[in-house]
Regions:
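Short hydrophobic alpha-helical segments enriched in small aliphatic residues
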Residues: 8-11, 22
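AMP-binding/adenylate-forming
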Residues: 18-19
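Non-catalytic interaction-recognition regions
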Residues: 23-114, 125-591
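Short, charged, solvent-exposed linker or helix-capping segments at domain edges/interfaces
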Residues: 115-120
Length: 591
């Protein structure tokens, strides 16, 4: 059973009774020993940070002698030799060597490292997790879909990255509240009403649903563009009038808005279910429209915002290094994104007591969020505000050039992408009779792992062949490694491990497992889920190397050795499942 980080956020109330343990890793343990030796030798209190060198140099390395050289005014290699002698005397290390100008390399016995791993797994906190965020609340804003539009590939990245960020926050002790802040208000709704009356009818809407609404929007925007070319604005003015009618609560206008929103929500829920993503709340812009205008009026009254002669309202941000003021209300009194976002900030601070808010939105909005966050500081909001931005979804075109992903019709719809992924997953299946559920897991794993295969800021390169490559950096490659382990564990009963087994054959696997808590911490601290993907791929490669040299459960393996190796595999299986769950990827039963 997986730890409760995958339950709804309110389930964490029970776990908050746990003490706020620091993450205890083998690296910390050996770093503390080096730190104590330095203190004993020189009376200096210094953090002896350890890193993982290439395996040929040892298990851990430290530059503490180089850092002490200036303070002690002595050659770093002499200091390193003195530290080495003390560490040798401790009997803790198999080997201590010095490299270069004074780097100290430490080699630990595999059996000692396995003991470290066993103790870490027995801790009260699930392995890989910590309590850095204990007692604090974070609100994650994703995927923030627009209603009356089909779910596009563009919103897929927000959903995937946001879900992983939410899981990372839970894994590091935060109470995480997720909100799909629906774009269910604003000028597009006026456009849909006018467009529906111009280009569609109830029969078409009932038959095609969200896709009819998408076409209506495109046709109406084109009609507005053609009118503007003639110097006319009739359709645009009608759309604005319908928006104001919705705002005033006009029954006919509200009926249109409710109808379009319900069609949209049904579609959004269906697609998010296929994507394996959900949120705790769906607080739409429309529900906060009144609060938004009230906030603007309050800010004008308090002198934080100022009203221009044309009636528009701005917040000046020069004191925060931003020359362009934030426009928070149009001259005709119509709201903007900023109007609603300020209301949302006020709502979340009041209702959720949020200490942090993470907005998972594409890089195109970087300047806007810089403005919004500066305005929030000026207003006096206390929450830490983070724009977790990501690059676009790209593809390689027929000329071999990387470009923004699109179809002949323009926007690539996520449902079509998921359908194609499942078709390819079935075609690439290695076994007969794989269930539809497993096909879906493989397809989704391929897409999501690609999303996390590089730093979110670099963009996502979409390539079908790479996505389903069973020998490369892909979701199916990692899933297959996990399936293989699960099958070995399923086919072999656990026994009593040989107490004298030295774990030399498993040492690199153990070291990789010991890295996991620090990888989770770094991924959470920097909001970089790709660190989890990189780690789990490296673990899969390490396991494949291990299988090549070490039989796990063949008949010629002694029972005690077999039990010891199966015990290690159970820990590997746990880490695979835990890490993939953070990314929102499920392990198939068969592939």
């Amino acid at each position: 059973m997986l730890p409760t980080l995958f339950h709804k956020w309110h389930a964490l109330e029970l776990r908050e009774l746990l003490p706020n343990y620091a993450t205890i890793t083998a690296m910390n343990k050996y770093a503390d020993q080096v730190k104590q030796v330095v203190k004993d030798l020189y009376g200096v209190d210094i953090n002896a940070e350890l890193t993982r060198p290439e395996a040929k140099f040892g298990d851990y390395a430290t530059n503490v002698a180089l850092r002490l050289a200036g303070q002690l005014k002595r050659p770093p290699r002499d200091i390193a030799n003195e530290i080495k002698q003390k560490l040798d005397q401790s009997g803790q290390f198999d080997e201590v060597t010095i490299a270069g100008p004074g780097f100290i390399n430490l080699t630990v016995s595999a059996k000692e490292l396995d003991g470290d791993l066993e103790r870490a797994f027995q801790a009260k906190i699930p392995y890989g997790e910590n309590r850095d965020g204990r007692g604090r609340v974070v609100v994650l804003d994703f995927p923030s879909t627009n209603t009356a539009k089909p779910f596009s590939v563009g919103h897929m990245r927000s959903a995937n990255q946001g879900w992983a960020a939410r899981n990372l926050m839970l894994a590091t002790g935060w109470k995480a509240i997720s909100d799909n802040h629906l774009g269910d208000y604003g000028s597009p709704f006026g456009i849909w009403v006018v467009g529906f009356r111009m280009f569609s009818d109830e029969e078409k809407l009932a038959k095609r649903g969200i896709y009819e609404l998408g076409d209506i929007y495109i046709k109406t925007k084109q009609a507005i563009k053609e009118e503007q070319a003639k110097g006319e604005h009739r359709i645009e003015e009608q759309a604005q009038d319908w928006l104001l009618r919705i705002e005033r609560g006009d029954p006919e206008a509200v009926a249109y808005s409710d109808k379009f929103n319900q069609i949209s929500l049904d579609h959004i829920h269906a697609v998010m279910k296929r994507l394996g993503v959900s949120t705790d709340y769906e607080i739409g812009e429309r529900s906060l429209a009144k609060l938004g205008k009230e906030e603007v009026a309050r800010l004008v009254k308090e002198g934080v915002a100022e009203q221009n002669k044309d009636g528009s309202v701005i917040i000046r941000l020069d004191d925060y290094g931003i020359e362009t003021p934030l426009l928070v209300l149009k001259s005709n009194g119509a709201p903007l994104y900023a109007t609603n976002d300020l209301a949302t900030l006020a709502f979340r601070e009041r209702e959720f007591k949020a200490d942090r808010a993470i907005y998972v939105v594409a890089s195109e909005q970087k300047f806007y969020f810089a403005q919004l966050f500066a305005a929030a500081k000026k207003i006096g909001y206390d929450a830490e505000l983070i724009h977790m931005w990501y690059g676009l979804v790209d593809q390689i075109n027929e000329d071999g050039v990387r470009e923004k992903m699109s179809s002949r019709k323009g926007v690539v719809l996520l449902e079509e992408l998921l359908d194609e992924a499942e078709k390819r997953a079935r075609a690439n299946a290695k076994s007969e009779g794989i269930s539809d559920e497993d096909i879906h897991r493989i397809a989704l794993g391929a897409i999501k792992f690609t999303d996390f295969s590089a730093d979110r800021r670099t963009g996502m390169l979409f390539n079908w062949d790479r996505m389903f490559n069973l020998t490369g950096y892909s979701g199916p490659y990692v899933q297959y490694a996990a399936v293989r382990i699960n099958k070995i564990l399923h086919d072999n009963k656990a026994g009593k491990p040989d107490p004298d087994y030295d774990y030399r054959a498993e040492k690199q696997v153990i070291l990789k497992l010991l890295d996991y808590p620090s990888v989770v911490k770094q991924a959470a601290d920097y909001l970089e889920p790709h660190r989890i993907a990189t780690y789990i791929y490296e673990l899969a490669k390490e396991m494949n190397r291990y299988y090549e040299t070490t039989p796990v459960a063949t008949k010629d393996v002694p029972a005690g050795v077999k039990a010891a190796r199966l015990g290690l595999l159970r820990r590997v299986a746990y880490v695979f499942e835990h890490a993939l769950k953070i990314l929102g990827i499920d392990i198939p039963e068969r592939m």
